[in-house]
């Protein structure tokens, strides 16, 4: 099982619309990429404003999903909710 975590660092002057992220962006990513599971974190304290963790069956499944045509739409939507450049971590769940 592979987990792709997308983390949004709390940077000076950051903007992050949690409602848009929860209600529009993550559902768009779910429809487009079809992961097995997704969890959203809303940062309360610490170095990150928000994060999402997607689970895929395999690295190949994740790569195929992210390479699809709809990924352009998912990426374009980022500007609608934040000015933060996210950090992406790909992990194998052991």
Please identify what each model-predicted range represents.
Residues 1-94:
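Macromolecular interaction modules
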């Amino acid at each position: 099982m592979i987990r792709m975590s997308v983390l949004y660092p709390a940077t000076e002057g950051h903007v992050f619309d949690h409602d848009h992220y929860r209600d529009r962006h993550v559902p768009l990513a779910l429809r487009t990429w079809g992961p097995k599971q997704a969890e959203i974190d809303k940062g309360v304290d610490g170095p990150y404003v928000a994060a999402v963790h997607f689970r895929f069956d395999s690295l190949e499944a994740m790569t195929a999903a992210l390479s699809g045509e709809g990924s352009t739409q998912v990426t374009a939507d980022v500007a609608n909710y934040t000015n933060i450049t996210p950090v992406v971590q790909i992990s194998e769940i052991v």
